[in-house]
Structures are given as C-alpha cells and as structure tokens.
C-alpha cells in the first residue's frame, strides 16, 4: 500500500473554513490499513467542498460546489450528534475491488447499525483516486459544509479523492436501507453495505 500523497497543491480552492467540524481530526486506519481491498490510504485527508472537480478549476464560468449549497430553512432536528461513524471508501484497481473499510459487500458480517431516533455524524474518507457518489436510501444526509443550521440535505454525496467530509443523519426510518456508491460498477464490485435502523 502507499500513501496517496495528496496535498493542498493538488486540491484547488482556498482550504477549509476556520470552523470546519473535522479540522485537526486524526484519520483512523486499522493495523492492516483496511486489508487487501485497499491499495492505498489517505494519511492527510483534505477539505474539498470548495473544489469544483477535475478539469473545472480553471473554468471561465462559475461552477457550483458543495460549499455553495444552503438549505432554505433549518431542519427541525438540530441536536448535536450522539456518536460518530468513520467510514473509508477503499479500492484496489489492480484487483478490481471496491469496498468500504476494505471489505466488499459479500465479505461483511452484518449491517451498519443506526439506533432509531438518534442523530449521528457520518464521516467519509476517500482512500481512492476516484470520485465516489455515495447514496443512502431512506434517510437524508445533512452535509456539514459550514452553514450550521442551514446544512443542505442530500441523499447522495460525492466524495472526491483524498477528501474527508461529514454529514449528520437523523435515523428516523426504521428498517434495512441500502448504502452504496452510485457508480454501478463500483457497487457491483463491492462498494455497498446495508444500514439497519432499529
């Protein structure tokens, strides 16, 4: 495995705002660096909500970025998250493996568990060199992009290479819900999980 080596020079944009909720956070990698399903890891993940994406940094027109999005009114549930879940988007292109935390869908023991009614923070770290649009069925993700109570609600959030971002989730929908990369060949190769709200 290798460190992706992505630094601010590759990121584009002016960097994270001073009140970024993940500023100074240590990224968590297991002792096996997420196993064979991860060809590389991000040792220094970056704030990229202000990055328009590959090929658009020098566009002569304005490009909408996640840092621009704002809800029209506050979501009623403004509780602080009760807990955090850190999830790594992992891949090994040489072995055509895509996964969460180094484990393909067919290799996990059980679902990701949300407690019904809880508010939690989902932290996603992209340890690959590709964008991953991550879709949670059944519930909204409230992207933490600096707008506080006006966090935008999203069902799908694209996580850029080397990026770490977070979203708050109100686990208000009991049952089993699919959680996956929306690039279907990544999903079929294993970048998918089930969320169980109970």
Give the location of each predicted region.
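Copper-binding active sites and cupredoxin-like electron-transfer domains
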Residues: 1-198
